[in-house]
Amino acid sequence: MNNRRFDCIGIVGHPRHPAALATHEILYHWLKARGYAVMVEQQIAHDLNLTDAITGSLADIGQKADLAVVVGGDGNMLGAARVLARYDIKVIGVNRGNLGFLTDLDPDNALQQLSDVLEGEYLSEQRFLLETHVRRTNQQSRISTAINEVVLHPGKVAHMIEFEVYIDDRFAFSQRSDGLIIATPTGSTAYSLSAGGPILTPTLDAIVLVPMFPHTLTARPLVISSSSTIRLKFSHITSDLEISCDSQIALPIQEGEEVLIRRSDFHLNLIHPKDYSYFNTLSTKLGWSKKLF
């Protein structure tokens, strides 16, 4: 493989359990011993008391590092990726979470796998993001991005909402439901999958719309081109209606506002070990049957 080598490595990711910080510390000293320039996310350096470390924010790491190693689960990866996607930096994950669809490296074998990656032995792909605008006429939009999905939902559990969906400015359907999931191929194995949506392979230029508990027997997931623009309109809005991006950022929707969702201009430069297989990951994470022969 004739891949780009790395000179400056960023270490990011906030583990749910303090014991997982040991992975960050081992990784830091391992990289330093091999002569790499290392930047550590500020809070991690503080938690580990790495007083001599070069520290920075996610944006600093995105600007100055060649590779970011995200230690944690998919939640950590999503939070970091929304920032790092704005920069020319490659990203790989060490799984210290549960499923780990986006974090490939096994913590017990991460250093060996990472050693190969640092030698240029890796697979590279781009994952697109969704950009969401909550807006009203003649006013500035509130904007956020998502790697996995954008979800329209009420604040109350099991509270039905009514809305219309327009695709490329053409009416597509109206719905009474608990909400709507708009997912990327990356997000098709997350919340969308739990709601009955299809799995989209990461190379597809597609977006899937998945109804949440629709008040009809005929509503089905809809797959559209990633170049399409989705517009959500409301006849009236309850006080707690929200748009959620990756279940981490919430944008309230107020009376007179509409929601616009489209493919972002940014993308995540995700890399994997050289033996990575998307379908093997699906089989392992979802417990699919083994090969018969």
Swiss-Prot record:
Cofactor dependency = a divalent metal cation
Q: Which Gene3D superfamilies match?
A: Probable inorganic polyphosphate/atp-NAD kinase, domain 1, Probable inorganic polyphosphate/atp-NAD kinase, domain 2
Pfam families from the UniProt entry: NAD_kinase (PF01513), NAD_kinase_C (PF20143)
- Which keywords, in A-to-Z order, does the entry hold? ATP-binding, Cytoplasm, Kinase, NAD, NADP, Nucleotide-binding, Transferase
Active-site residue numbers: 74 (proton acceptor)
Residues annotated as binding NAD(+): 74-75, 148-149, 159, 176, 178, 186, 189-194, 248
Q: Where in the cell is it found?
A: Cytoplasm
Give the record's GO CC terms.
cytoplasm
The biological processes this protein is annotated with in GO are: NAD metabolic process; NADP biosynthetic process
Which Gene Ontology molecular function entries are recorded, alphabetically?
ATP binding; metal ion binding; NAD binding; NAD+ kinase activity
Q: Which EC main class describes this enzyme?
A: transferase
Q: Which reaction does it catalyse?
A: NAD(+) + ATP = ADP + NADP(+) + H(+)
Fetch the InterPro entries from UniProt. Answer: ATP-NAD_kinase_N, ATP-NAD_kinase_PpnK-typ_C, NAD/diacylglycerol_kinase_sf, NADK
Task: Point out the annotated site residues (description: Responsible for conferring strict specificity to NAD).
Answer: 176
Q: What is its EC number?
A: 2.7.1.23
Looking at the keywords, is Transferase present?
yes
Q: What does this protein do?
A: Involved in the regulation of the intracellular balance of NAD and NADP, and is a key enzyme in the biosynthesis of NADP. Catalyzes specifically the phosphorylation on 2'-hydroxyl of the adenosine moiety of NAD to yield NADP.
Recorded family membership = Belongs to the NAD kinase family.
Q: Subunit info?
A: Homodimer.
Q: Which HAMAP family match?
A: NAD_kinase
Q: What is this protein called?
A: NAD kinase
Species name: Yersinia pestis
